[in-house]
Amino acid sequence: MAGSTGERPFSDIVTSIRYWVIHSITIPMLFIAGWLFVSTGLAYDTFGTPRPDQYFTETRQEIPIVTDRYKAIDQINEFNN
């Protein structure tokens, strides 16, 4: 026989008006914050990934794939030049 942990049952929480008042604001705000994070370009700057227009340059039209594990830094420097 299981004992009580003293916590409110999940069904009580989900059917609570207070729960929905709080979450009807916070859940959409999370989506808006994520959209702003990506649309402003901050995500590209934070994680260091190239923007979609930076994958291919005028001089380099091939896919920048690192093929040699031990000369990876040299290959990445070639891709950036």
Swiss-Prot record:
Domain of life according to the entry: Bacteria
Cofactor binding description: With its partner (PsbF) binds heme. PSII binds additional chlorophylls, carotenoids and specific lipids.
Binding site for heme: 23
Principal subcellular localization: membrane
Cellular component annotations (GO), alphabetically ordered: photosystem II reaction center; plasma membrane-derived thylakoid membrane
GO annotation, biological process: photosynthetic electron transport chain
Membrane topology: Single-pass membrane protein
InterPro entries tied to this protein: PSII_cyt_b559_asu, PSII_cyt_b559_asu_sf, PSII_cyt_b559_CS, PSII_cyt_b559_N, PSII_cytb559_asu_lum
Keywords recorded for this protein, A-Z: Electron transport, Heme, Iron, Membrane, Metal-binding, Photosynthesis, Photosystem II, Thylakoid, Transmembrane, Transmembrane helix, Transport
Record-annotated membrane-spanning stretches: 21-35
Subcellular location: Cellular thylakoid membrane
Gene Ontology MF annotations: electron transfer activity; heme binding; iron ion binding
Cofactor section: heme b
Quaternary structure annotation from Swiss-Prot or TrEMBL: Heterodimer of an alpha subunit and a beta subunit. PSII is composed of 1 copy each of membrane proteins PsbA, PsbB, PsbC, PsbD, PsbE, PsbF, PsbH, PsbI, PsbJ, PsbK, PsbL, PsbM, PsbT, PsbX, PsbY, PsbZ, Psb30/Ycf12, peripheral proteins PsbO, CyanoQ (PsbQ), PsbU, PsbV and a large number of cofactors. It forms dimeric complexes.
Family indicated by similarity: Belongs to the PsbE/PsbF family.
Reported function: This b-type cytochrome is tightly associated with the reaction center of photosystem II (PSII). PSII is a light-driven water:plastoquinone oxidoreductase that uses light energy to abstract electrons from H(2)O, generating O(2) and a proton gradient subsequently used for ATP formation. It consists of a core antenna complex that captures photons, and an electron transfer chain that converts photonic excitation into a charge separation.
HAMAP family: PSII_PsbE
Protein name, UniProt field: Cytochrome b559 subunit alpha
Provenance organism: Picosynechococcus sp. (strain ATCC 27264 / PCC 7002 / PR-6) (Agmenellum quadruplicatum)
Lineage summary: Bacteria, Bacillati, Cyanobacteriota, Cyanophyceae, Oscillatoriophycideae
